[in-house]
Amino acid sequence: VDKPDYRPRPWPRPN
């Protein structure tokens, strides 16, 4: 089974 690529992205934190 091919797993989706889960990569930690630098999401902009909602201040």
Swiss-Prot record:
GO BP annotation list: defense response to Gram-negative bacterium; innate immune response
Lineage top rank: taxon: Eukaryota
Keywords tagged on the record: Antibiotic, Antimicrobial, Immunity, Innate immunity
Induction line: By bacterial infection.
Cellular compartments per GO CC: extracellular region
Keyword set includes NAD: no
UniProt keyword Zinc, yes or no: no
Function noted in UniProt: Antibacterial peptide active against Gram-negative bacteria.
Protein name per Swiss-Prot or TrEMBL: Metalnikowin-2A
Originating organism: Palomena prasina
